[in-house]
Amino acid sequence: MISKPDKNKIRQKRHRRVRGKLSGTADRPRLNIFRSNTGIYAQVIDDVAGVTLASASTLDKEVSKGTKTEQAVVVGKLVAERAVAKGISEVVFDRGGYLYHGRVKALADAARENGLKF
């Protein structure tokens, strides 16, 4: 019998392939996205130093209401505001192997509207 492909394993393989070509520096850190069934998480990461510079997620108190897409918009706004407050204006967008659609796109658009360039 044919086995069903594991979508998360395929996504992780895609993410590893992209991460080989993409990394964040202190000048232009990486905006990383992780999407679970219940939430969405965003981090601005300096890969050279191995440090998270700013982060936001649906676990924050400001993000508790609304649909998942509305929550993604608020997370994008929060991570952009926190990054700009630390003097970060340009980032490299790492969509984490997810399609640029839905919650990932909503978060990216909100981050752009609030001052991040990518």
Curated annotation (Swiss-Prot):
InterPro entries listed in its UniProt record = Ribosomal_uL18_bac-type, Ribosomal_uL18_bac/euk
Q: Which residues cross the membrane?
A: none
| UniProt KW Ribonucleoprotein keyword | yes
The Gene Ontology biological process terms listed for this entry are:
translation
A Pfam family annotated for this chain is: Ribosomal_L18p
Q: Where is the composition biased (Basic residues)?
A: 10-20
Q: Name the keywords, alphabetized.
A: Ribonucleoprotein, Ribosomal protein, RNA-binding, rRNA-binding
Region of interest (Disordered), residue spans: 1-24
Would you tell me the Gene Ontology cellular component terms?
cytosolic large ribosomal subunit
Identify a single GO molecular function assigned to this protein: structural constituent of ribosome
Q: Does the keyword Endoplasmic reticulum apply?
A: no
Described by its record, this protein's role is as follows: This is one of the proteins that bind and probably mediate the attachment of the 5S RNA into the large ribosomal subunit, where it forms part of the central protuberance.
Q: Its family?
A: Belongs to the universal ribosomal protein uL18 family.
Which PANTHER family does this entry report, sorted A to Z? 39S RIBOSOMAL PROTEIN L18, MITOCHONDRIAL (PTHR12899), LARGE RIBOSOMAL SUBUNIT PROTEIN UL18M (PTHR12899:SF3)
Instruction: Enumerate the HAMAP family for this protein.
Output: Ribosomal_uL18_B
Q: How is the quaternary structure described?
A: Part of the 50S ribosomal subunit; part of the 5S rRNA/L5/L18/L25 subcomplex. Contacts the 5S and 23S rRNAs.
* NCBIfam families per record: L18_bact
Q: What is this protein called?
A: Large ribosomal subunit protein uL18
Say which species the protein is native to.
Streptococcus mutans serotype c (strain ATCC 700610 / UA159)
Taxonomy of origin reads:
Bacteria, Bacillati, Bacillota, Bacilli, Lactobacillales
